[in-house]
Amino acid sequence: MPASLQMSSFELKEVGTGRFELVGEMSFDTADKILESSRRLFGNYAGLEVDLSQVSKADSAGLALLLEWKAQANQKAGAINFLGMPDSLVAIARTTEVSDMI
C-alpha cells in the first residue's frame, strides 16, 4: 500500500514502487521535515524517482535537500531521479554551479 506523509505545507507520498511525489513547499521552513519524512518513506529502495512538478515554492534549502537525497542514494549504490524540477531550483543550481550534481 502506498505511503503518504502530510505536514502543514507539504506532502510527500509514494505513488508507486520507488516513485514519490512532493506537493507544496521545499523551503527553509520545510526542508528538515521533508528530509525526516523521506527517511521513513524511501526505506531501502535502490532506485528512486521523485516528481517535483507540484512544488509550489522552492529555495536554496530545497536544493540542499535534493543534494542530500543524491548523497544518500550514492551511499546505497543506488540512484535518484528528479522529475518536473521547479524553475527556481534549476536557477539556483546553475547559479551555485551544482546543476551537474542533481
Give names to the regions the model predicted.
Residues 25-102:
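Amphipathic alpha-helical interaction surfaces in cytosolic regulatory modules
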